[in-house]
Regions:
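Beta-strand elements within well-structured catalytic alpha/beta cores of enzymes
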Residues: 9, 55-56
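Acidic/histidine-rich helix-loop elements
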Residues: 17-30
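Metal-dependent phosphoester-hydrolase catalytic domains
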Residues: 44-55, 61-148
Length: 148
């Protein structure tokens, strides 16, 4: 609770795309099932019509148009969350560096309920990109400011 506003933060880490096996078709299925299970829990706990503010943050291990991400954005015509567009100081969107394949991807997201999204401070959503950003992890930190 902040300044009398009760809200919830959910942090998640969905199944990785990369496994020890070269071809792991179950990884995609598991990630989608994880997303659906979490989404269903949120829908039961927070009805969209109630307007309860919440934020989902974490490593979704998938691209922004993937089935797991879509599970969190809407059901039929009902918006569940809105994607917070984080960007680094160079205008880049990548949050993960995979050294083995020398590839950059956006796997980490902030998803805000419609009522929480309205509290976001304009132009406050960033991806940390200082020279030491990847020392602690292969993911870069994402963050945004919200007003209460």
């Amino acid at each position: 609770e902040v300044n009398g506003v009760r809200w919830n933060l959910f942090n998640l880490h969905l199944k990785s795309k990369w496994t020890e096996r070269k071809d792991d078709p179950n990884a995609n299925l598991r990630r989608e099932k994880e997303a659906r299970t979490i989404r269903d829990y949120l829908r039961k706990r927070f009805l969209p019509a109630d307007g309860h503010p919440y934020l989902i943050a974490g490593d979704f291990n998938d691209h922004k148009n993937s089935a797991p991400l879509r599970r969190f954005l809407q059901v039929n015509d009902i918006a569940l969350t809105e994607m917070v567009q984080c960007v680094d100081s160079n205008g880049h969107f990548w949050t993960h560096y995979y050294a083995k394949q020398d590839s950059y991807s956006r796997l980490d997201y902030l998803l805000a309920s419609p009522s929480f999204f309205k509290r976001m401070v304009p132009e406050s959503a960033f991806i940390a990109d200082r020279h030491f950003s990847l020392w602690a992890s292969d993911h870069r930190m994402i963050y945004a400011d919200f007003e209460f």
